[in-house]
C-alpha cells in the first residue's frame, strides 16, 4: 500500500477547503479548525503553496488566503510538488542505481505504475475534486 504523508494530505485538504469558497478570502484559522490541522503546520504548508503560485495570501493579524489560479489549472501533482513531497514509488523508479536493474522482475511493472501514478495526479484538478 502506498502511503502519502500527512503534510501532503493536509495541503490537499486545505487547498480544497479554499477552492470550495471561490469568492472568499479564507481565514487560516478557519481552515485549521475545520480540517483539524495544527495552525503552525498549516502556515508552513500555505507558505509552500504560495511560493509555487498556487495560493495568494493577505498578510496581517488574521492571515487570509485564496487561490492564485483557477481550480481547473491546479493539479494534485502541483500540490504534491509544492509541499516538496517525493513523487517516487520506489528507489528504482527514482533512478537510483541498482545492480539488479537489468535482471529485476519488478522494474518494468513499477516503472509503468510510476508513469500511471504521475499521469493520474497531473490529470486530477481541483475543479474535479471540489464540485459545486
Predicted regions and their residues:
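Short helix-capping/hinge SLiMs at alpha-helix to coil transitions
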Residues: 19-23, 69-70
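A short alpha-helical element within helix-turn-helix/winged-helix DNA-binding domains
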Residues: 29-37
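Alpha-helical residues within the helix-turn-helix
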Residues: 33, 50-51
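Short, hydrophobic-biased segments on the C-terminal half of alpha helices
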Residues: 15, 46-47
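Non-DNA-binding regulatory cores of transcription-related proteins
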Residues: 68-132
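Beta-hairpin "wing" of winged helix-turn-helix
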Residues: 53-62, 66-67
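Short alpha-helical segments that sit at the start of domains
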Residues: 1-14
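Key DNA-contact positions within bacterial/archaeal DNA-binding proteins
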Residues: 40
